[in-house]
């Protein structure tokens, strides 16, 4: 599984539709793509929302972003992430 940070920005219309039902539906979208939601955070400022998700690959996170935007009206910017331990291994493998 790959880890992705999904930063969400609410539109005025999206703010009006905030509900636990919509959150459950959003989580079901991630699960349907064989992924899982690791954590969800509401934030102050921009962005408004952070989802930490695990999905099989980048194609799946693209699908998730599109489906979540269609469902919620939230615009997402997504970044891949690796643990520091994984980063250290990658760095060591190219530094000789």
Regions found by a protein language model. Give the residues of each.
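Short, flexible, solvent-exposed loop/turn segments with mixed acidic/basic and small polar residues
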Residues: 38-42, 66
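C-terminal end-helix/capping segment
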Residues: 74-96
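An amphipathic, aromatic/His-enriched active-site/gating alpha helix that lines ligand/cofactor pockets
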Residues: 55-82
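A generic structural signal for alpha->beta connector loops
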Residues: 34-37, 73-75
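A short beta-turn/loop motif at secondary-structure boundaries
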Residues: 41-46, 82
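Short S/T/G/P-rich N-terminal loop/turn motif that feeds into the first structured element of a domain
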Residues: 1-32, 36, 44-47, 88-96
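Short hydrophobic/aromatic beta-strand micro-patches
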Residues: 9, 52-54
């Amino acid at each position: 599984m790959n880890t992705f940070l999904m930063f969400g920005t609410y539109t005025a219309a999206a703010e009006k539709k905030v509900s636990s039902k919509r959150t459950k539906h959003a989580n079901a979208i991630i699960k349907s793509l064989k992924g899982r939601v690791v954590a969800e955070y509401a934030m102050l400022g921009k962005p408004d929302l952070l989802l930490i998700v695990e999905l099989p690959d980048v194609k799946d996170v693209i699908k998730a972003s599109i489906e979540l935007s269609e469902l919620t009206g939230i615009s997402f910017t997504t970044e891949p992430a690796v643990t520091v331990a994984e980063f250290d291994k990658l760095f060591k493998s190219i530094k000789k």
